Amino acid sequence: MKQYLDLMKKVLEEGTPKADRTGTGTRSIFGHQMRFNLQDGFPLVTTKKCHLRSIIHELLWFLNGDTNVAYLNENKVSIWDEWADENGDLGPVYGKQWRSWGAADGRQIDQLKNVLTQLRQDPDSRRIIVSAWNVGELDKMALAPCHAFFQFYVADGKLSCQLYQRSCDIFLGLPFNIASYALLVHMVAQQCDLDVGDFVWTGGDTHLYNNHMEQTHLQLSREPRALPKLVIKRRPDTLFDYRFEDFEIEGYDPHPAIKAPVAI
């Protein structure tokens, strides 16, 4: 994951000091891209230990169309708790938009089912897209989508995906986002009888929070290790039937975890 460390260095050296919604302050650049060949290994950061349970359960939660933290809490995942209301609700965030986008005529559009249909029937389409950025519902969301828009692409029997992330917390959020979308590509590829290709990450406001600087320098002092391998143990009937125990990460040998505060 040298690309990830190189991004950290770039922001430290070239970033602009900026104020932000949380009041924490950041060092920021605008516009950056990284490409990960998923044939080379699973892109999980090794210079600190990442919490795999949270990454996998969060993605399964999105895929289920869920927007309440109860499922996450039942599985010892607390990454969304700070934004939930007293009932655990987050409003129409990712899961709602991915699985039941509300159309003007009252229809509920399942973007992910549409993607699967397109990949099977028209894999050369340039419209195989999922958007979480629903302008009409942003004010009802506990947190506006950071990873807002992604597109699939098929070439030579391989499935690739590009994500546009409008706002990126490099230290805490980005390792999760890369691993989550890489996992999604593997799952969709399995369901569509494709091999995996590239995951392309594109960032808008790409930043390090001022209270993550010590942790960033510690991480940069560590040498990256070999990427692990993702094993999917079974093929469920649909994309929406995967379970946590279906996934195994082989050969993950990270440096110790590094704690840092979340900007809310």
Curated annotation (Swiss-Prot):
Binding site for (6R)-5,10-methylene-5,6,7,8-tetrahydrofolate: 51, 169, 263
Cellular component GO terms held in the UniProt record: cytosol
Database matches in PROSITE patterns: THYMIDYLATE_SYNTHASE
UniProt keyword annotation of Cytoplasm present: yes
Subcellular localization: Cytoplasm
Keywords per UniProt: Cytoplasm, Methyltransferase, Nucleotide biosynthesis, Transferase
Subcellular location, principal: cytoplasm
Pathway the protein acts in: Pyrimidine metabolism; dTTP biosynthesis
EC number(s) from the headed UniProt entry: 2.1.1.45
Catalytic center residues: 146 (nucleophile)
Pfam families recorded: Thymidylat_synt (PF00303)
Annotated GO biological process: dTMP biosynthetic process; dTTP biosynthetic process; methylation
Residues annotated as binding dUMP: 21, 126-127, 166-169, 177, 207-209
Disulfide bond residue pairs: none
Entry's Gene Ontology molecular function annotations: thymidylate synthase activity
Catalytic reaction annotation: dUMP + (6R)-5,10-methylene-5,6,7,8-tetrahydrofolate = 7,8-dihydrofolate + dTMP
InterPro entries: Thymidate_synth/dCMP_Mease, Thymidate_synth/dCMP_Mease_dom, Thymidate_synth/dCMP_Mease_sf, Thymidylate_synthase, Thymidylate_synthase_AS
Alphabetized PANTHER family for the sequence: THYMIDYLATE SYNTHASE, THYMIDYLATE SYNTHASE 1
Assembly: Homodimer.
Family: Belongs to the thymidylate synthase family. Bacterial-type ThyA subfamily.
Biological role: Catalyzes the reductive methylation of 2'-deoxyuridine-5'-monophosphate (dUMP) to 2'-deoxythymidine-5'-monophosphate (dTMP) while utilizing 5,10-methylenetetrahydrofolate (mTHF) as the methyl donor and reductant in the reaction, yielding dihydrofolate (DHF) as a by-product. This enzymatic reaction provides an intracellular de novo source of dTMP, an essential precursor for DNA biosynthesis.
The protein's name in its UniProt record: Thymidylate synthase
Protein's organism: Pectobacterium atrosepticum (strain SCRI 1043 / ATCC BAA-672)
